[in-house]
Amino acid sequence: MARIIGIDLGTSNTAAAAMEGGRATIIPSAEGSSIGGKAFPSYVAFTKDGQRLVGEPARRQAIANPEGTVTAFKRRMGEDYKFTLRGQEFTPQQLSAFVLQKVKKDAEAFLGEPVEKAVITVPAYFNDNQRQATKDAGRIAGLEVVRLVNEPTAAALAYGIDKAGKEQKIMVFDLGGGTLDVTIMEMGKEGTFDVLSTSGDTKLGGTDMDNAIIEWMVSEFKKSTGIDLSADKQAAQRLKDAAEKAKIELSTTMETDINLPFISAGADGPKHLELKLSRAKLESLVDSIVKRCGASIDQALNDSSLKSTEIDKIILVGGPTRMPIVQKYVEDHAGKKIERGIDPMECVATGAAVQAGILTGDVKDVLLLDVTPLSLGLETLGGVTTRLIERNTTIPVRKTQVFSTASDNQPAVTINVLQGERPMAKDNVPLGKFDLDGIPPAPRGVPQIEVTFDIDANGILNVSAKDLGTNKQQHITITSKTKLSDDEVQKFVKEAEKFADEDKKTKERVDAKNEADSVLFQTEKALKEHGDKVPQEDRLNIDRALGDLKEALKGDDVERIKKAKDDALAASQKLGEIIYKESQAKAQGAAGPQPGAQAQGQPNDGGKEDVVEAEVVDK
C-alpha cells in the first residue's frame, strides 16, 4: 500500500511523521529546527516581489513585512472569512494548504518517494464545518486525507503504542496554540484505544497567553514613554515574537530580559523597550487563562462517569503544557501527577503516523474507537431538537428513526440538521437543511419518513430522508458554514448547564402541548368515524372535555394542559371501548403502528424505530 504520513496541522506549529522500521519518525523541516523544535511555525507570507514563504522563513521576515504575513489561521477554519495579504485574499483552507504543501515537499525529500496520502489531526472539539475545511485544505495541497484523527487521541496512540498488554485509563490534556481538548480514554490489553469522553474550548490556548504578555509590555512601555504601541503594525510582530520567546524561556528560568531596540520614536529620538519579566509575574498574567481549563477537565470526567482517582495516567500535549503553572494546575485540579518523558510538541504527529500505520497494516493489533464531541439531531414540531446521536458516541455510527408529517396532506418535509446540547432548535448550531418533497396526500401522522444520520470515521456527517411509502429519498453531506463563531460551539454544553431549568420548562411545555394536540387530533378523528355510536351523555362529556382542552392549548400553563388532556382521555373512554369492540368483531388485529400513533422513538422487537407522530416541521 502507498505510503501515508501523519500530520499535526497546528495553530502555532506544524509537524509531520512517518512509520520507518516499525516506529514513527518525525520528518524534519527543510530549514532545520526552529522555535518549535522539529516542528515548524505555521506562518505564511508574501513578499513585495510576490514570493511565497512558508514556515520559519515566513516567521523570520514577519517584523519587516507585517502586511504580507499571517499566522494562527487555523482559528478561522470552517468560517466564511478571508485574510488579505498584499492585496490578495486567501481563505483559511488556502493558507493551511500552503503549510501542507511544505509538509508534502519535506516528506518526499526525507523519504525519497512521492507522498500523496495523509492522516491529519484536528482538535477534538472541531465541528463538522471545520473538519470539512481541513479535508479541503489537504485536497488543495495535493494530499488525499484518508483519515482525520482527534489530536488528543493521536497523542494517546503515541503514548500507548509500546505499552500493549496494560489496561489503563488515560486523561489527555491537550493545550495548543489556539485550542484546548481534554479527552478520557481507556487503553485495553488487546490494543484497543476507546475514547470515553472529550471536552474542550476552541478559543483557548498559548496565543491567549502571548496576548496577555503583549498587553503587559504595551502598558509598561506606555507608562515610561507615553507612546501606545497597540496600533503599530510593525511593532506588533516584534512584540508577539518577544512574548512567545519570554514565555518559552520562563518554563526553565526564573527571569528573562525583553529587549526591543528602536521599537518606536518620540520627539526626543528613538525609543527602546527594555523590560524584565519574572516567572512569578508571568504566572500572574496568565493565571485566569489557565484556570479556564478546569471546566473542560471537569466536563470530560463527568461525561466519562469516572472520578479523578480512577485515572491512571495524565498525558500533557502542546507547547503551553511545558509551563510550570499549567503542569501544577492540571496536577492540582485532577489530583494526580502528570506523566513525564513525552514530547508535547511531537506526540500528536507521532500518533497520526501510528494511525497511518494502522491503515496501511504496518501497525498490527491496534483498534482505535473515537467519539463525536457534540450531539446531533433535527428540528421537530414546536422547535424541539430531537437527538439521533448523543455526544461522546463512538464513531463511526449510523442511527435511523422514523418520523411523520405535522399536517394533513403535507406535500413535503424540511429536514433541519442541528448540532449542540440544548433542547430547543434555536439554541443549537444549524448545520444544513434539505427538503423531501413529493409525499402523496395523506392525513397527518400516516406518512412514514425514515431519517438516517451517518457519521464516518472522520467525524463527518451524512443525513438522508426516505419516504417509506414511495421510496423517494434525499440526502446531504453536511458542508454548510456555521453562522456561529468557534467559541459559541463550545458554549453549548456550558449553556445547557447554566440554563438547565429554563430549558427543562420550555421542553416540558412543548412536550405537553404536542401530547395534548395528539390526543385532540386522535379523538376528533375517532368521533368522525364512530361518534354516531356513542351514547348522547358520553358524547356531551367528550365534546365538553375537548373544548376545555382547546382552551388550555391556547395558553402555556403546563399543569392545566396536562389536566385537560387527562380529562379528555377519561371522557373518551367509552369511545375507545366502542372502537375496540368493533375491531374485535371484524377480527382485523392488524400489526404495526396505527396512522398517527404517538411513539417515543424506541426500537420495537423487529429493530425498527416507531413512528414519532407529527414531529417533522412543515416546509
Curated annotation (Swiss-Prot):
The modification Phosphothreonine is found at T179. Residues 606-619 have a biased composition (Basic and acidic residues). PROSITE patterns: HSP70_2, HSP70_3. SUPFAM superfamilies: Actin-like ATPase domain, Heat shock protein 70kD (HSP70), C-terminal subdomain, Heat shock protein 70kD (HSP70), peptide-binding domain. Residues 584-619 are annotated as: Disordered. Residues 585-605 have a biased composition (Low complexity). The keyword Nuclease does not apply. Induction: By stress conditions e.g. heat shock. One of its GO terms (molecular function) is ATP binding. Gene3D superfamilies: 1.20.1270.10, 3.30.420.40, Actin, Chain A, domain 4 (3.90.640.10), Substrate Binding Domain Of DNAk, Chain A, domain 1 (2.60.34.10). CDD domains: ASKHA_NBD_HSP70_DnaK-like. Keywords: ATP-binding, Chaperone, Nucleotide-binding, Phosphoprotein, Stress response. Belongs to the heat shock protein 70 family. PANTHER family: HEAT SHOCK PROTEIN 70KDA (PTHR19375). HAMAP family: DnaK (MF_00332). Acts as a chaperone. This is Chaperone protein DnaK.
